[in-house]
Structure formats: C-alpha cells, structure tokens
C-alpha cells in the first residue's frame, strides 16, 4: 500500500469536531481574553492608585508618603492607673488627718499612721510600694527645697517592716537627676534603707491616659517604677512657690510627668488639679520638718527656711495641703490657691480640713 494511500485512509478515520465543540472552544477563548483584559486593567489601576497615593499629602489616611519615618514606628501603648487609684478602704472610726510634732522622725511617722489606723491598714505583706519624694532641685536638704532624707528613711523602714516585698523610690527632677539625687541625700537614704532607686531614663516612660484631665489626658508618665506596684505614697516638703503660691503633696506628682511639662506653667492650678485626678495615693506625708516659707520653690538661702518639726499624714492630699497652708506656712486668712477649688469640684478631696477628724500628737 502506498504512503499516500495510508495517509488518506488515516485522515478519513479521524473524527471531525462537532458544531457544539467548536462553539465551546470559541467561548473558552473569549473568556480567556476577557480575563486577561481585566487583569491588565486591574494591574494598571493598582499602579495608578499607588502612584497617586505616593503623591498624596502625608496627613491623608491612605497616603503612602512618610517623610519623617513615623508611619513605620509602632504606636505607643496607652497605660492606665487603677480606676480607684491606690487608696485603701475607709475606716470610719479613725482620724482622717494626723499631725505629729517632734524631732524623732520614725516615731512621729509611726504615731501619725497609728492615728489613721496603723501602717497595717495601708501596707500588707507582699505589697510593691512606690514612694515619691520631691527631689526637683540640686539642693542640700537643709535648704528645704527637697524631701528630708531622714524622713524618707523612716518611711521606707516602716513600709518594709509592714511586709512590703519591694519599695521603689522615684522622681523626675527638674535639674540633672543624678546630681539632684546625690546632693539632696535621697540616693544615699534610699540605698541605706534598702529600697530601689529609679532614675528617669527615657525607656522608663510610657504614655498615660487620664480620662477627664484638662492638660494630661494623654501624657508621658514615669511608668517604670509603677509596673507591678499596688501602693503609692507621696512624701514632699512644704514650701513657698512663686507660681502656685505653695508646693505641697498634690503638686508633688508633677515629678512623675515627662515631656515638655514646663508648658503647664501657663495654667499651674489647672495642672495641679489634673495631678490630683491622675494619681490617688495610698497616703501622703507632708514633710514640714523644715518649712521653706519664702523664695520657693528653689530656695537657696538658709534664711528662707524655718524649723517646722512637723509631719502631716492623710489619705487626702487636699486636706494635708490645706492644713499646711493655714498652720505651717502660717497663711491662715489668705485665700487658698486656686487648685484647691478646682480639685474639690472634681470631688478629689476636702480642702476644709476642719471638717475632718483630726488627731494631733507630740512625739519626743
């Protein structure tokens, strides 16, 4: 059989495609063309959109522009303090305000705390306690601008004897922190009493939320020492202040703020009222062993300081401050600084200390 004959025979045995098969093949080709066209258009649109977004203003939500590199940084975690602060429950049968006079600081402090129900009311075994002194300036304690280190030692010892697992001392001074802690004697006192000192390194700060605050609803806060803490005590000197008229236990919390806090001087009473809202302590100690009665808050002259030989202890910082204003700065009859009214309007304390239960004692 010839080759040509075999080819002819083979062609006649192949099945011819049906009209339905031909139509299906054509439809498949049309779908493929449409799919390719859509993909091409989609890719072109995405490229065009990306090009446009790369040119859109940086503040636009979908803009791809990031001239400062901020978009790639993680958002800071917003911290919060306990809703009820660090306060302990009320005990109706004890004093609200205790005033101890004398020169033996530990005995004075213990006596004042006993009048409020005893140190055991405030500090339990296993507590982690933050103590906030005022170490704002590079001054020796004798000038009255910073917390008396002897009072701090007495306070740390009482807290540790009550069973605290850890005691932390922290402040963010206005002047050089290292120099302030050394010159004031607070560093040596902290170490001698067995507490841990926190210096305000940048990584110790976090953004804190304070709902309802006027100035610091979201503000950098000295968070490091507060991590895991469940009790907070403020211990601050009593002193004249050229802006807010007096710096005492409520103003003391200013030393926990970071950022550009000097801007708050434009509304000093407003920021102090915010501080009262921000932090509600376990108790406060108004250190009036010395009284800086003029040239505050920095002082600098022994002639501006007088002996006070007094410690005021309360859960209510407004009450402690108001007592200090009237009786220790001896400004009774003068109107209280405006932060008292602003804080009281938020129900953050009682500036009329005479309405509270007061216990006064002399020790040594």
Language model: regions and residue ranges:
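Short alpha-helical segments used as structural interaction elements across diverse proteins
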Residues: 30-31, 35-36, 129, 248
């Amino acid at each position: 059989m010839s080759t040509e004959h075999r080819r002819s025979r083979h062609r006649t045995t192949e099945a011819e495609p049906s009209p339905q098969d031909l139509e299906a093949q054509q439809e498949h080709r049309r779908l493929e063309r449409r799919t390719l066209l859509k993909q091409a258009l989609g890719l072109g649109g995405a490229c065009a959109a990306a090009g446009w977004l790369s040119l859109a203003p940086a503040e636009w939500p979908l803009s791809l522009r990031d001239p400062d590199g901020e978009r790639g940084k993680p958002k800071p975690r917003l911290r919060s303090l306990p809703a009820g602060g660090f306060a302990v429950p009320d005990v109706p049968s004890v004093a609200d305000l205790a005033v101890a006079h004398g020169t033996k600081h530990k005995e004075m402090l213990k006596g004042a705390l006993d009048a409020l129900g005893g140190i055991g009311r405030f500090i339990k075994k296993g507590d982690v306690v933050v103590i906030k002194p005022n170490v704002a300036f590079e001054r020796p304690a004798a000038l009255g601008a910073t917390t008396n280190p002897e009072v701090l030692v007495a306070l740390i010892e009482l807290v540790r004897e009550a069973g605290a697992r850890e005691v932390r001392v922290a402040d963010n001074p206005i002047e050089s922190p290292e120099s302030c802690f050394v010159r004031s004697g607070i560093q040596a006192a902290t170490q001698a009493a067995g507490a841990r000192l926190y210096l305000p390194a940048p990584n110790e700060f976090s953004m804190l939320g304070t709902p309802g605050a006027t100035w610091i609803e979201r503000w950098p806060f000295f968070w490091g020492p507060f991590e895991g803490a469940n009790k907070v005590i403020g211990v601050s000197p009593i002193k004249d202040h050229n802006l807010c008229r007096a710096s005492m236990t409520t103003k003391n919390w200013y030393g926990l703020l970071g950022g550009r806090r000097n801007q708050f001087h434009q509304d000093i009473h407003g920021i102090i009222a915010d501080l009262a809202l921000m932090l509600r302590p376990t108790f406060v100690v108004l250190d009036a062993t010395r009284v800086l009665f003029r040239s505050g808050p920095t002082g600098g002259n022994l002639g501006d300081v007088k002996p006070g030989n007094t410690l005021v202890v309360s859960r209510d910082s407004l009450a402690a401050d108001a007592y200090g204003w009237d009786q220790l700065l001896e400004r009774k009859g003068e109107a209280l600084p405006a932060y008292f009214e602003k804080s009281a309007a938020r129900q953050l304390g009682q500036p009329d200390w005479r309405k509270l239960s007061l216990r006064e004692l002399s020790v040594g």
